Amino acid sequence: MVCEKWIFRFLVKGEVDRKEFIGWLKRNFPQSKLLRLILEKLELMNEDPFKYAREKLGADKYGNPMFSIEVTKDIRILYSVDSKNCIVFIWEIGSHKKVYGR
């Protein structure tokens, strides 16, 4: 199925809406250059969440495939995709250690 529009669900600290998510991003990534890079990657994911995936990481708790996308050498976005319902779940954004726990 090809999705014309993707719905984003932000689950970084429990489920939050877009406004709360942007606030969370600004608090956690106050450097304007890094914040801009994160927003650019999210925009690319909005076009096609599979195209820029760095690696497949198994499945989320709903059974959807999980991926990561590289923002910088150390910063990753961990997300999953429900292609049947055109939903992208954002699970975590942070350092390699924070995202992967290692």
PLM region descriptions:
Residues 1-74, 82-89, 93-102:
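Basic, Lys/Arg-enriched alpha-helical interface segments
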